C-alpha cells in the first residue's frame, strides 16, 4: 500500500514519504530517499507499537499505544470507556445502551459524531489528538515530505484534521513541520490493484 500511494497516489513525486494504515490496526510503510525501507529484519514501520500514554486503549498488546488511539479497534475501546463512564454516572447515551456496549464500532461512533453528538465527537477528538502526537514524532525523526493516512482518517478527515494539525504545529520541530504535508490516501478501493502494480515495478527497479 505504501508503494502504491507513493508511485500512483498522494505521495507521487516525493522522495521521503510515510504511509499509515488507519484501519483495524495501525502500521506504516516507509519510503526513504526514494526507496522502500524495511529495516534490518523487515520490522521498520511498526509505529502502532509506540506508547503515547501510560493510560488508554490497548493496541499491539500495549496500553496507551499509538495503535490504541489511532485504529478502528482502538477507537471502539475508547468509545466503550467513554460511554461506560456516562452510563455509570446515570447519564443516558442515546445511541448506545449497556447491552449494546460490546457492539460499538468506530464507524458507528463516526456516524453519531457527524450528526453532532458531543460524546461521539469527543471520542474522535481524543483519537485526533494522539494521532497528532504520534505524527509529530514521525516528523521529528524521519523528516518526510508527506505523510499519507488511509482508512478511518480518510473517511473522517474533516473531523480529525484540524485537531491533529493543531497538535502537530505545537509538538513537531517547526523546520521539519514546514516541509511536511499530511494527506489522506488517494487510491481508495483501487489500492489493491495499484499495490500489485507497484510491487512488480519495485522488483524490476
Please place each PLM-identified region on the residue numbering.
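Glycine/small-residue-rich loop that forms an oxyanion/phosphate-binding "nest" at active or ligand-binding sites
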Residues: 1-5, 20
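Short beta-strand scaffold segments in enzyme catalytic cores
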Residues: 3, 26-31
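ATP-binding/phosphotransfer module of carbohydrate and carboxylate kinases, centering on a glycine-rich
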Residues: 5-14, 36, 54-205
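Short glycine-aspartate micro-motif
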Residues: 16-21, 27-29
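Conserved beta-strand segments that form the floor/walls of ligand-binding pockets within enzyme
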Residues: 21, 31, 51, 148
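Conserved catalytic-core motifs of eukaryotic protein kinase domains, centered on the activation segment
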Residues: 42-43, 160
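A short, polar/charged loop-to-alpha-helix boundary motif
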Residues: 43-56
Amino acid at each position: 500500500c505504501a508503494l502504491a500511494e507513493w508511485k500512483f497516489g498522494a505521495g507521487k513525486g516525493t522522495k521521503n514519504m510515510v504511509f499509515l494504515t488507519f484501519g483495524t490496526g495501525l502500521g506504516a510503510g516507509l519510503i526513504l530517499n526514494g526507496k522502500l525501507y524495511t529495516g534490518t529484519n523487515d520490522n521498520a514501520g511498526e509505529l502502532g507499537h509506540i506508547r503515547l500514554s501510560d493510560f488508554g486503549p490497548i493496541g499491539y498488546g500495549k496500553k496507551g499505544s499509538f495503535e490504541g488511539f489511532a485504529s478502528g479497534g482502538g477507537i471502539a475501546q475508547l468509545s466503550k470507556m467513554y460511554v461506560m463512564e456516562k452510563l455509570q454516572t446515570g447519564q443516558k447515551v442515546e445511541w448506545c445502551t449497556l447491552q449494546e456496549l460490546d457492539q460499538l464500532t468506530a464507524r458507528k461512533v463516526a456516524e453519531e459524531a457527524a450528526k453532532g453528538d458531543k460524546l461521539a465527537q469527543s471520542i474522535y477528538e481524543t483519537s485526533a489528538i494522539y494521532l497528532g502526537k504520534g505524527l509529530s514524532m514521525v516528523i521529528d525523526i524521519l523528516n518526510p515530505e508527506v505523510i499519507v493516512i488511509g482508512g478511518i482518517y480518510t473517511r473522517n478527515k474533516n473531523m480529525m484534521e484540524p485537531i491533529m494539525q493543531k497538535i502537530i504545529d505545537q509538538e513537531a520541530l517547526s523546520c521539519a513541520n514546514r516541509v511536511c504535508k499530511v494527506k489522506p490516501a488517494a487510491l481508495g478501493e483501487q489500492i489493491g490493484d495499484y499495490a500489485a502494480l507497484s510491487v512488480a515495478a519495485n522488483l524490476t527497479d
